[in-house]
Amino acid sequence: MPSSISWGLLLLAALSCLGPGSLAQDAQETEASKQDQEHPASHRIAPHLAEFALSFYRVLARQSNTTNIFFSPVSIATALAMLSLGTKGDTHTQILEGLDFNLTEMAEADIHQGFQNLLQTLNRPNTQLQLTSGNGLFIDRNLKLLDKFLEDVKSLYHSEAFSTNFTNTQEARQQINSYVEKGTQGKIVELLKELDRDTVLALVNYIFFKGKWKQPFNEEQTREKDFHVDEATTVRVPMMNRLGMFHLHHCSTLASWVLQMDYLGNATAIFLLPDKGKMQHLEDTVTTEILTKFLKNRQTTKSQLYFPKVSISGTYDLKDVLSSLGITKVFSSEADLSGVTEEAPLSVSKALHKAVLDIDEEGTEAAGGTVLGNIRSTLRYEVIFDRPFLVVIYEHHTKSPLFVGKVVNPTQQ
């Protein structure tokens, strides 16, 4: 066993969102209130996950304003929280504080119970919404982990443990990639392109989401239209459209249109379309409090909506992003992962995250409920998503942001 060992930490998320539709009804709010009583543990960590999500987003947005952004804060936070079980000292503190937790305000046991409850809820069978997540621990067959760490990651994070031959990097890479590909139903293939030779432990998290809109768009109405990436760049995209009742309003604080669309089941997508030239203002101004207020106070109007079909992905080396959030020790020779194993010093050599977003017309019925012949209210808005916009996808039962992103160019893979 070498004296210096690196731990490869891999994080990923896959999302397939199929077809926009109108938003939640009173029944959904009633169900959500029942869930509030059933799942207080996950609700306690939800505000912190939301703050982490926005902080993470802003780091990525500062790095580039010309590329799409898409990631799963729940996936990244889950992997880091699980990793924190084996850390000590400053390494431990940095991870939890980087996730927006303050141990003087919330006991660490409550944090891990929150994640345990979150994972249990997300993996609950749902006939209307496909939502699954998983944690895999790939352990070198010659490495002895501490019993407590192994017990905690299995009981709190429902992690599966796999014996892995890391001396054969090609075999180990294939084993990890196969686990990810299976968990994401083939949406993410070959996440891990290469594996460091001194890796002895890999932690993998995935989340898979496939939702259908309550009221889908009619595919026959989709037409090619212009999407203005910036003042100098215009691309042609398939633009869906529907006349209907939408949870849609203009927010003067954000200088943006706010559109909320529910999935069958228990998730909602919030789309934020800034006024022309106001993307920077939106990114600087949006807060978790504002987003929460949108979810609680919905305004329904009859509108003509134009929305692009989207297929984008985001792949990130988390080391740079997390370092900007103060999580640095775990990636250095000063890392204290003595709660994982006592055999040799560990540090995280690689932290990868990939998320995939697909949005199209599809719904449970081909065109059910899409024609508004009996709705007599006056058409109030015509809103066209033909320029960059933000998206946040919330899971209602846990009150958590599953995915966050920015669509700059729908044709950019």
UniProtKB/Swiss-Prot annotation:
GO cellular component assignments: extracellular space
SMART domains named among the record's database cross-references: SERPIN (SM00093)
Region described as RCL: 368-387
Top-level lineage group: Eukaryota
Expression (tissue specificity): Expressed in liver.
One MF annotation (Gene Ontology) recorded for this entry: serine-type endopeptidase inhibitor activity
Site feature location: Reactive bond: 377-378
Record-linked InterPro entries: Serpin_CS, Serpin_dom, Serpin_fam, Serpin_sf, Serpin_sf_1, Serpin_sf_2
Signal peptide: 1-24
Alphabetical UniProt keywords: Glycoprotein, Protease inhibitor, Pyrrolidone carboxylic acid, Serine protease inhibitor, Signal
Record flagged with keyword Glycoprotein: yes
Sites carrying sugar chains: 65, 102, 165, 266
Record PTM Pyrrolidone carboxylic acid, positions in chain: 25
SUPFAM superfamilies per UniProt: Serpins
Keyword Endoplasmic reticulum carried by entry: no
UniProt xrefs under PANTHER family: ALPHA-1-ANTITRYPSIN, SERINE PROTEASE INHIBITOR, SERPIN
Family: Belongs to the serpin family.
Domain text: The reactive center loop (RCL) extends out from the body of the protein and directs binding to the target protease. The protease cleaves the serpin at the reactive site within the RCL, establishing a covalent linkage between the serpin reactive site and the active site of the protease. The resulting inactive serpin-protease complex is highly stable.
Protein name in UniProt: Alpha-1-antitrypsin-like protein CM55-ST
Lineage start: Eukaryota, Metazoa, Chordata, Craniata, Vertebrata
